[in-house]
Amino acid sequence: MLSVRTMCNGSFYLYITESKKMSKVAVTRVCLKDDYYLNAPDSVSNCEDAYLFIRNQIGFGTVERVMILCMDYDYHLIKCAIVSIGNDNKAVLDIGEIFKIALLLDAHHILIAHNHLGSSLIPTESDIQITQKIGYVGNILGISLIDSIIVNAGENYQSIRRYIMEREKKNGLDEHL
């Protein structure tokens, strides 16, 4: 028995079967769909390049949000996404979700950002630990973490990478992200 099916994109597939009964199986593709477009910097290789864009997206929020910026090999911004929306105190972050997006976009670099609702830009221990885990997993996958930053409605931001390095320098340690 010979069966030819044409797909919507013009390609076709061919079934060559004997007398065995065949059944249809759904084929699923995982892809990212653009929701809307924003004016964003062309390239992001450090926190300063991204700060105003990030602050305008999540800095004025009433709940904590976590955002990822994905860049190609030359630091050109590919896409950005909100990966978590929390409450007024915290946002739960799934590291797998971050890297699923980065891998689907073939990103070479990522920058993570989240907002604090109050005036404090000091990272919590949880902020530091999750940043270190993201950096570790990124190294394994070949995706560099440029930084993780905290923004609020104010005129400044906090680099968690810089905060960790300054804290370790103060404590006499050399380990970095």
Language-model-derived ranges and their functions:
Residues 45:
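Extended substrate/RNA-proximal surfaces in nucleic-acid metabolism proteins
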Residues 2, 6-31, 36-39, 49-52, ...:
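Active-site-proximal loop/helix of nucleotide/amide-processing enzymes and allied scaffolds
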Residues 50-56, 60-91:
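Mobile, glycine- and charge-enriched loop segments
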